[in-house]
Design a protein with these regions (language model features):
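PLP-dependent amino-acid enzyme catalytic core
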Residues: 1-502
Length: 502
């Protein structure tokens, strides 16, 4: 039985179902498994098996309190015709790399991979825990999580979903995806501020005892659809396992041979899922963490010091415009606990992480111990600026006829820089995190196309040039009526939640 504990050391352990419902631990920490299970199969034995089967086996290994029948229902509900690609996640070779295309779901971004199944995991957990309260899902988004969460939870009985996004920090297509969302239980607000303001505001609401008590009296409890929720993170592990199986299938690697994994990284959840896959038994040589000009992670992985005391940049890869990378806390916990006696590991690591997070809160920085810094050696890091991002898009399209969005282009550029610097020819999987059509204006600019009047004209122009099909969720988006018009100050999130839940 695998239980879940807080990264900040609180003693009580939760089942997976309890952790999924709660979202955030009482001491403000994030839930982590008390052990990372071994792969339940040999990857080579799963060649040719459908994505759903692999996803179910990986989730079952972590979420041991869910029954086989429950998880089958979850994966069947999640990974169905909502995904437009054959077998959910294509792996496509281009430019000497293997692109793991995670954007073929309803909202054309990788967030669909986890947020299609989270509502099923959550409602199953609520039933099993006899949770009779309504669950209000609070979500901060830098663009993609919000729409994927709205799509996943729209009209799900027993839930409300409230999303906050930076009013001037998402693409036109992303904003329209959210503000046109249908569903009687959906609530969307732009905020005057950036993603970190939204994420901090949501965390503060979770940690406001009086606010939560007031909701409790009204029969409502809060949970999260952000990757701070372990129910978001664990389903993401499956697609890295699947990628390795596909590389065996197409002869890129022999069983047991190592791969590199490159991930465009903001909140650290996606690359942490790759780390979990390696700890289960997928052979990984290097995790290559790719940032844009908000290169807080590049600097941290290089120096061991994390500092948010820096300028915030609005870039053409807005989903990575983040300075407070929440899921990094989970990695630091695992590295701190490594090698310690089982009886004291949680308490020792929890105290260390709590101290680091307190320092970040009070001093805007922290420096990790030598032990933790040594554990970061499995990670390489780099960043790409906006001009380099555009150049990578053009190079890949012109040389390989392969279309990348801006975030994937950051990853490709950082990988190319890593390969030049190291000579490392290990086969690489690059997480391709969004359809180019979500950032069509930036992609068109990269390809030297003339500017268009709006983001939707850009979509049509990009389609005319490339012939790449427009995801069905983005077609005619500009013709849908806007249903959510609220824009609030970053200090007003709690008021907006209370008003939405009346």
């Amino acid at each position: 039985m695998i239980n879940y504990r807080s990264t900040r050391g609180s003693k009580d352990a939760k089942t997976a179902a309890q952790a999924v419902i709660k979202g955030l631990a009482e001491d403000k920490g994030l839930f982590v498994p008390d052990a990372i299970p071994a792969l339940p199969f040999k990857p080579e034995d799963m060649v040719g098996r459908p994505y759903k089967e692999i996803a179910k086996a990986i989730i079952a290994a972590f979420f041991t309190d869910y029954t086989d029948e429950e998880l089958q229902a979850c994966v069947d509900g999640a990974y169905d015709s909502k995904f437009e690609a054959e077998d959910v996640v294509p792996v496509v070779k281009a430019g000497g790399a293997y692109f793991l295309e995670l954007y073929h779901g309803r909202t054309a971004a990788f967030k669909d991979m986890a947020l299609s199944i989270l509502p099923y995991l959550l409602t199953t957990a609520m039933k099993n825990e006899n949770e009779e309260k309504k669950v209000a899902i609070l979500t901060a988004t830098s663009g993609d999580t919000g729409k994927a969460a709205l799509e996943g939870f729209a009209d799900v009985p027993g839930t409300e979903i409230i999303v906050f996004f930076p009013e001037d920090g998402v693409s036109e297509v992303q904003k329209r995806q959210m503000t046109t969302q249908e569903g009687a239980n959906t609530h969307v607000f732009g905020i005057h501020g950036n993603f970190d303001d939204a994420q901090t505001g949501v965390k503060n609401i979770f940690n406001d005892d009086a606010f939560n008590a007031a909701l409790n009296e009204r029969g409502i409890r809060l949970s999260s659809a952000n990757s701070i929720n372990i129910g978001r993170l664990i389903p993401q592990v499956a697609y890295y396992v699947y990628a390795y199986i596909k590389l065996i299938e197409n002869g890129a690697v022999k069983p047991g041979e190592k791969i590199n994994i490159t991930v465009p990284t903001g909140n650290f959840g996606n690359i942490l899922a790759a780390y979990y896959a390696s700890k289960m038994g997928i052979p990984v040589n290097k995790f290559i963490c790719a940032s844009n000009e908000n290169k807080v992670l590049t600097d941290f992985l290089t120096t061991g010091t994390y500092s948010t005391d820096r300028e915030f940049h609005i870039t053409n890869s807005p989903s990575m415009d983040i300075l407070i990378s929440s899921n990094l806390e989970r990695l630091l916990y695992h590295l701190s606990a490594a090698g310690l006696d089982e009886s004291s590991a949680h308490e020792t690591a929890g105290a260390e992480i709590a101290a680091l997070m307190k320092s970040l809160d009070q001093n805007k920085s922290y420096t990790v111990s030598d032990k933790v810094k040594a554990g970061l050696a499995d990670f390489a890091a780099g960043y790409a600026d906006q001009a380099q991002t555009e150049a990578a898009i053009a190079e890949m399209y012109n040389d390989n006829n392969y279309l990348m969005d801006t975030h994937t282009a950051v990853a490709y550029k950082v990988y190319e820089d890593y390969k030049k610097a190291t000579g490392d020819e290990t086969p690489v999987v690059i997480a391709s995190t969004a359809s180019a059509y979500k950032f069509a204006a930036s992609v068109n600019e990269a390809l030297g196309m003339p500017a268009e009047a709006d983001g939707f004209a850009c979509v049509r122009a990009l389609n005319a040039k490339t012939g790449v099909p427009v995801p069905s969720g983005l077609k005619d988006l500009d013709k849908k009526p806007v249903r959510h018009t609220g824009v609030i100050e970053k200090t007003q999130l709690a008021d907006a939640v209370m008003e939405s839940l009346k």
